[in-house]
Amino acid sequence: MSKIRVYELAKELNVSSKDLITLLMDEFGVEVKNHMSTIEDEEAQLIKELLATKPEYIEGSLEDSKSLVDEYEEILQNELNKAKKKRKKNKREDKDDENEELETEVIEIGETITVKELAEKLNKPSNDVIRTLIFSGVMAAINQEIDFATAEKVCESYGVILEKLEVTEELEAVEAEDDDEENLTKRPPIVTVMGHVDHGKTSLLDAIRKAKVTDTEAGGITQHIGAYTININGEEITFLDTPGHEAFTAMRARGAQVTDVVILVVAADDGIMPQTKEAINHCKAAGVPMVVAINKIDKPGANPDRVKQELTEHGLVVEEWGGDTICEEVSAKSNLNIEKLLEMVLLTAEMLELKANKERKAKGTVIEAKLDKGRGSVATLLVQNGTLHVGDAIIVGSTYGRIRAMFDDTGKKIKSAGPSIPVEVLGLSEVPEAGDRFNQVKDEKTARIMADKRKDKEKSDSLMSGNRVSLEDLYSQIKEGKVKELGIIVKADVQGSVQAINQSLEKLSTDDVKVRVIHSGVGAITETDITLATASNAIVIGFNVRPDNNAVAQADKENVEIKTYRIIYDAIEDVKSAMIGMLEPEYKEVILGSAEVRETYKISNVGTIAGCYVLNGKLQRNAETRVIRDGIVIFESNLSSLKRFKDDVKEVNTGYECGLTVEKFNDVKEGDILECFMMEAIKRKEL
């Protein structure tokens, strides 16, 4: 006996499969699991007849407000559909009998999916899927997104079950996983060294790590965040090496978010400086305790008491003065009191009672990330809870992967890392953003699905925000007509540097000149970057990276400027100079001279000629001139002609008489003062 599938019957009756399933189970007692289930042809015929006599069973099939014409059109369409079904009936019945016992194909998607991706999942040509959408009343291009309901209709027509992915709840569960108190054990403190430029942050870390890195770093400024673990008296301390320059405010603030204790370095001879104040404010905002290290106390002119006094002005009262701020006088150069400083750090950490659960799934933060030519995506992760193992699947922001290899801060291969331990990992699909959170998940498939969902959300958010910003900018530029824009493409060796440069450049924007970072990324400057710069009329900035040969050739051909730097401060200063060069000059009024009208003459076809006596300075032909009567400016124009006797002259000096006419002004009267002036352009020297 022949059978028919539920979705086919639903099509014939012009109702949704969901409504028909409810109808079959509730009203007719026919057991069906989903729209791919089959029912006997006899049952289907009975249902058709019953519904033909009682159309009220079809929920929402006909509305009371429908016109008679609409009803006839619908009936006609149903008849046409039935005719098509009859032509293919025999083939379908045979096929149904053969496939009845086969497992129905199921595919999973998120809230939305592009037409191209859906076609790939269905293993059908994109054109077929687009055609199906058109028959469903949806006009969509190959790269256009469609929602779950629309995709479900398409899958239904191909006999495929579509299920919605629900991965958000799982990720939230991972993030919100609570730890039992009995599973918590003591963990090492995570310490960040902060302070003003050249106050000795890197030198202090040198003294702590017994490794000289200062001399190898350009300009004496730490170029990007590294992470190191040291052992003191049997206890471990993890140091985050954050850049100390003012341009790295964002990176320093991010460092404070994963930090337990901050060592605030203040030079004994300099005292509190702008970046020191910045560091203090970041620590207070993050609620991170500080241990003050007064450095360079062995230097001539050192005055630790003055530093302590200045600290008091910023709400940090040292212990010896009755406060609660731990302060240690040290010298990174001579290793003076370094051990004491570390003991104070451990004491502060002990008061915080830092604990973590080693037995749970790992989670933490990306400290740094870069693209290595030989190893691919390399990320420095700081494990903040749980234990990370080689082979674990992780999701990092909108990136995912399985850890192929893991290295400690000395470059040694390790198999696992517990809380507060920084590790360098290989195996991520892309370079993550520095500061991204990472979570261990059950398998790589789950990680990929989560990452894809996050990417889709970021993409839609950026498209929405991008459209809004563009429209607002376009409106304001049209309205003002004066806004200039400097387009920049940023490439750097590590993600942290990219973020720092981007944030510093954004701060340079003013009402007159806007800085727009068109593209930024990690890696060498490529031909693609030059092509983008050409199209966007932008300059290319490289930090610790070089352009490849193709990029250089393309840049020469297209006249694109490539500038490379080793110190970020220099890059920011150069961009600032370029912006200043784009500014309109300021104008200053310079008085050339003034004259009194002694007599007036009216000449036909010429107008009123003023006979004047130059009181001071000089009058110049074509100079801007204002007419002043009784101390009030009544007109501004140019001197259209200037004569001495019958001769045309360019200028007339003090004490001489002359005849002149003011352009478009014939109401000159005796006693009027004519003041000549010019607007002198002054090149702007600052934003």
UniProtKB/Swiss-Prot annotation:
G5: annotated span: 331-333
Database matches in Gene3D superfamilies: 1.10.10.2480, P-loop containing nucleotide triphosphate hydrolases, Translation factors, Translation initiation factor IF- 2, domain 3
Spans annotated as G1: 195-202
Biological role: One of the essential components for the initiation of protein synthesis. Protects formylmethionyl-tRNA from spontaneous hydrolysis and promotes its binding to the 30S ribosomal subunits. Also involved in the hydrolysis of GTP during the formation of the 70S ribosomal complex.
Keyword Oxidoreductase: no
Phylogenetic classification of the source organism: Bacteria, Bacillati, Bacillota, Clostridia, Eubacteriales
Annotated region (G3), positions in chain: 241-244
Localization (cell): Cytoplasm
Name of the protein this chain belongs to: Translation initiation factor IF-2
Coiled-coil blocks: none
Region of interest: G2: 220-224
